[in-house]
Curated annotation (Swiss-Prot):
Transmembrane regions: 4-24
A GO BP entry: cellulose biosynthetic process
Name assigned to this protein: Cellulose biosynthesis protein BcsF
Similarity comment: family membership: Belongs to the BcsF family.
Entry superkingdom: Bacteria
Paired cysteines (S-S): none
InterPro entries per record: Cellulose_BcsF/YhjT
Length: 63
């Protein structure tokens, strides 16, 4: 059976391990999240490569 002091010791032990690891990993977290997003997520809002065309109704004013 675990007592309250055992639970507090486990919480403090985890805090001593994971807070410094998170602080050290924060600069590379952006790179990791971008890499996983590019690997697993579908690209959105991407237009196919091609020439830029103007709509046929839009015409310049002749002066």
């Amino acid at each position: 059976m675990m007592t309250i002091s055992d639970i507090v010791q486990i919480i403090l032990f985890c805090a001593l391990i994971f807070f410094p690891l998170g602080y050290l990993a924060r600069h590379s977290l952006r790179r990791i999240s971008d890499t996983t997003r590019l690997l697993f997520a579908k690209p959105r809002y991407v237009k196919p490569a091609g020439t830029l065309r103007r709509a046929t109704k839009v015409k310049a004013d002749k002066k």
